[in-house]
Amino acid sequence: MRIFRFSEIDSTSDFLKRKDDKRDYDLAIAETQTHGRGRRGNNWVSQKGMALFSFLLKVEEDISIEEYSKLPLVTGIAVLNGLKRIENLDFKFKWTNDIYLEDKKICGILVEKIQDFFVIGIGININNSLEGAVADIATALTISTGKKYIVEDVIFTVLDEFKKQYKRFLCGEWNFILEEINNKNYLKNREITLVGNNWEIKGIAGDIASDGRLEIVTEKEKMFANIGEIHLKWD
């Protein structure tokens, strides 16, 4: 595993995408990012004290792209378990790509594919302070515990946990992984709104299905939301 460290960079994920000699588990770490982003191209505002990192994952030829659509969920439970190894707090997984603590976002995940690699980008609020409107919707590990952490220790713990969960995934243990995810399903039983092109549907979130879709119960029917096809909001 090669490690690339930066005090500042545009994006750790973009750095890895630009590399010509990509290798499995190449890891890029930055203190700050100037052009970090989340799903749908949303800007990801970075601060010093965050864990900002991305790594490469070589595509396994015998795993279908449909199976790999579950990778954000596998990454999510890996981050959650990694954080729980550091502090035994009640972390939750919010479908499809966030970790929550005390009803606030503490981590965002972005999984992208380039050629025969996945680029997995992760941003975790660790030692950074949060003020203003951001403090109403996000939190950091230090805010919950009052402690300071060695950021790279957090990164390597999360990466170690990812390798364990990914090995389980490759060994056919997806149903067991999914059960763990659903036990930490932040949206379950919450009223949410699915938002598409010129339409909205309100419903109650249920479990995450075996294919990675989120169950939604509306007044008329039970439906399933696909990863990446819609976005959602909730009260």
Regions found by a protein language model. Name each.
Residues S7, F93-W95:
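Short loop/edge segments at beta-strand edges and connector loops
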